Amino acid sequence: MTLLWTPEELAEATGAAPPPAGASGVSIDSRTLEPGELFVALRAARDGHGFVADALAKGAAIAMVDHVPEGVGAGAPLLLVPDTLAGLGALGRAARARSRAGFVAVTGSVGKTTVKEMLRHGLSAIGPTHASAASYNNQWGVPLTLARTPRDARFAVVEIGMNRRGEIAPLARMTAPQVAVITAVAAVHLGPLGSLEAIAEEKGDILEGALPGGVAVLPQDSPFFPRLAARAEARGLAVVGFGEGPGATARLRDVALGAETVSAIVELSGAHLPLRLPAPGRHMALNATAAIAAASALGADPGRVAAALAFFRPVEGRGRRVPIRVPGGEALLLDESYNCSPVALRAALAVLAAAPATRRIAVIGDMLELGEAGPALHVEVARDAALSADLVFTCGPLTRLLHEALPEEKRGAHAADSEVLAALLPPLLRAGDAVLVKGSLGMRMARVVQALKETAR
């Protein structure tokens, strides 16, 4: 077994006494833990100390704890620290310090997980690449990603998210990337932050962690580009703007939107790189442009990265296309269930509008964390929904406003929550339908997706 962390490294990083063994990996979930890994008992919604005994029984080499949990013997292999989240952070910083990989950090109001996955996919064609799992982008997800960085990684891609002001900067400093990417500044988390200007300021904090002499990949077409570029230059970073405008360093051109694909040309450093993605939507092409620019900034061949993206598959819940069997044939499910904002919903509706279908159905849950602007933003998007869909189903108190703003012939059912729609929708589908499911994470729209997969027969 190859050790990711030796006993001595664990002790040096955390300041704890050396444990009796090293670890082949790092886990915070006893359900998915692999034998030989370090289990970190985080205090979250459920206290991880209650699962230490289970983790050790499943083969954990060590458990990081802040006390000896009940039911765990004094001789158990424990790494005792004052605070397990701080201990995980110490491992993350130590992993970053020892790694020789090229690090890229990605944030943004929309598209960050997709860009992260595009970078994972494209850079893997060049060399060993490590990246954040799922959307592990918060105060425990970032240090966990860093602590898991393989010793032989050539590239590492770290996603950084936020819910409140002041969360990005410390995670960016911990990551210390050579390349920092901001995908977009949009009305997401508008409630907690209060304005687009505050959102831009918070997203720009990723630049505070970037290493001097590094590169900032920024959305050229955003009205906040000049402000972000000035911050980057003040940090000693080179600026690469991506977008469709003539001033973009990485410029997306000749976009051809298909029902199931998008193709384009990416102009970068005098080269004209052909791009073809097996995922539709202009927003996907822009995400790919950001990923190609970031990979190039890390020293990867952008042509090879662009070519590799021809085999990219969208992340579950973020644009994945799933054929589902229905009476008389097949329908197409567009799974956008993971999260939602006005700009992301409009992009998804544009994909639905282009889908080859006899009937286009949009299933929309509330867009949360929009603050006082929330009601008006839901009403505004009703026009896009009416133009893109033949029938619109909604759930949640905010989408009731969207529902009421629709032309009567476009109104499907409105429900209080996604559980009701999950029971209602499957019997209504017909062969040839295309169904888009999208809503904020808190609306649990994945229940609708699962119901359509399981019961639409």
Where are these regions (language model features)?
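Phosphate-binding loop of NTP-binding sites
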Residues: G87-Q220, P226-R235, P427, Q450-R457
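A glycine-rich beta-strand to alpha-helix segment
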Residues: T107, L425-K453
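Short beta-strands and strand-loop turn motifs
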Residues: A101-T107, H130, V181-A187, P219, ...
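N-terminal leader/targeting and accessory segments in enzymes
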Residues: M1-A90, A94, A354-A357, D384-L387, ...
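Acidic, Mg2+-coordinating active-site environments of NTP-dependent enzymes
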Residues: P69-A74, V179-L332, A357-T358, R383-A386, ...
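Short acidic-hydrophobic, aromatic-tinged amphipathic segments that line or gate anion-handling sites
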Residues: L79-D83, G412-L421
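Active-site beta-alpha connecting loops in nucleotide-dependent enzymes
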Residues: R43-R46, V315-G317, S337-H414, S440, ...
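Residue-level signal for inorganic ion chemistry
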Residues: L10, E37, A55, L91, ...
